[in-house]
C-alpha cells in the first residue's frame, strides 16, 4: 500500500509512546524527523497556553490527567510543525469552504485554522463558503499580483471530504478545476465515500493536480486516502486542527454552570443517539438528582452569525464561542459529536462519548490520538446511550464531576 508514497518526504517519524498512541506519522522531512523525535523541544505560539502543572486540567479525575495534557500539547505542536513545513514560503492563501452554518464544531475548526495561519504569518486574501458565493474570476483578480510560489489554496478541514456532504466536495473539486497546478493544502479531514464512482472521479481529478496535499486526521481516513489518492498526491496524517488551540480551561472557568449534565446529541444523518428523546434520560437522571439538558447545538445560532452583514470572521468566532460556552454550562457532557469531545477535552470538562454511527468518526479519531485522555473523570468512549448513562452514574457516585 505504501509503495507509491514519496519516500523523500514520507518517512516513518516515531511511535507516540509518550501518549500511548499506536500509530505512525508520515509526511515530514528528515530535518523535521530529528525535531519530532524530541516533542518537548517543539514550540508553537499555542504552547504558552499549556496548563499549569500545579493545576490539572481535569481537577476531579481520580488519576492524574497529565497524560491527557501531554497529549494535547503534543498534538498542538505537531500541527504547527507540519503546517510550517508544508506552507513554507507561502504568504497568502484563499480559504475554501468556510462553514457558514450553525454547527459549532466546524466554526471551532475555522477559528483554529485562522489561528494557525496567523501564527505562520500567512494572510487570508479570499474566503468562500459555498459554490453560490464562489467566484473564480474574483479570486484570479485578487491573486494576479501575488507571486505564484507565495500563494496557496487552503481547504477547510472537518469531516466532509467525500460524498457524505456532496456540496462541500463539489466546491473543492470546482476550485481544483479552476486553479490547476496551484499549491493546494487541506486542513485535516475525515474521509468517507459510499459511491465508488464518485471516489474514482475525485481520484482522477486530483491525480491531474499533483500539487494537492491531502491531510487526514485519523488512521482509517489516512489509509483510505493513501489507497485512493496516494499515487499522485501527498497524503498526511495529523491531529484535528482544533488541537492547535491547546488547553482552554479559561472558557470553562468563566462560564456559569446551569445544569449538571448536558446531553448533546446529533440530529443530522450522522447521529446515533436517542435524538432529543428527553424521556429516555428523564427517569435515570431525576432518580440521581441530576439536572440536565438534552439538545443539539445545530438548533440555534448566535445573533452575530444571523446578521447577513457580519464578516466570516465574526460569524465563525461567535459560533465557536457559543459552542464552547454551551458545553461549559454543564458539569459533565454526554455527546456523539467529535468536536464536543475535542472542545470538552481542551476545556477540561469530564465527558462520555457515544459512538454508534456507521462512520466511526469519533472512535477513529480517539483511537488514533487520544488514548492518553481515556481516563475516568476525563473522557471515555462507549457504544450505546445505556452504557453512557451507567458510566455517568458511576462517575456521579465517585465524585468525578
Swiss-Prot record:
Low complexity compositional bias, start-end: 39-50
Span of the signal peptide: 1-30
Keywords from the UniProt entry: Cell wall biogenesis/degradation, Signal, Transferase
Molecular function (Gene Ontology), one example: pyruvyltransferase activity
Keyword flag Signal: yes
One cellular component term from this protein's GO annotations in UniProt: cytoplasm
Enzyme Commission number: 2.-.-.-
Pfam families in the record: PS_pyruv_trans
GO biological process, one term: fungal-type cell wall biogenesis
Cystine bridges: none
Annotated region (Disordered), positions in chain: 38-64
Assigned protein family: Belongs to the polysaccharide pyruvyl transferase family.
Known function: Involved in cell wall biogenesis. Has a role in the addition of Gal-beta1,3 moieties to galactomannans and their subsequent pyruvylation.
Protein name: Pyruvyl transferase 1
Source organism phylogeny: Eukaryota, Fungi, Dikarya, Ascomycota, Taphrinomycotina
